Amino acid sequence: MLRCDLHTHTSYSDGTKSPQELIKLAQERGIKILGITDHDEIAGIEEAMEFASKVGIKIIPGIELSSIYHDIDVHILGYMIDYKSQELKNFLKYVKDIREKRAYRIVEKLKRFNINIPLDILKKHAGYGAIGLSLIHI
């Protein structure tokens, strides 16, 4: 039987493992096909594909897009995406910028309650992921 996992996240979004670490884990578990579906992010796909090709794992390039439908948060999985598309990259940058601005506003509101969260610490914790500085880090 061919083992696969089509819904995974790397440290480029809310996963804890880099693309290489995730692929090593997949290899240890006998997974031959791995879908990289980071939240609103595609930055780890190329890195994953390059490393996976060396260890015999097929990467399905994907994404998990966040959206709202009738005031309900939904996540939409997309597979076999064009991760090199400049239009997609521009859209994802726009989404990241909106999240970061919202996070800054929340930090400012928390100061009114004497809750001071240094932005440099939040940015360090957020790392390089697509989620960027977001609610998850506050």
Q: PLM features: residue spans?
A:
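Conserved phosphoryl-transfer catalytic core
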Residues: 99-125
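Generic hydrophobic/packing signal
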Residues: 63, 80-82, 114
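Active-site gating loops and adjacent loop-to-helix segments of metal-dependent hydrolytic enzymes
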Residues: 68-100
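Alpha-helical scaffold segments that flank or form the walls of functional sites
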Residues: 22-33, 97-109
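Conserved small/polar residues in nucleotide/adenosyl-binding loops
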Residues: 136-138
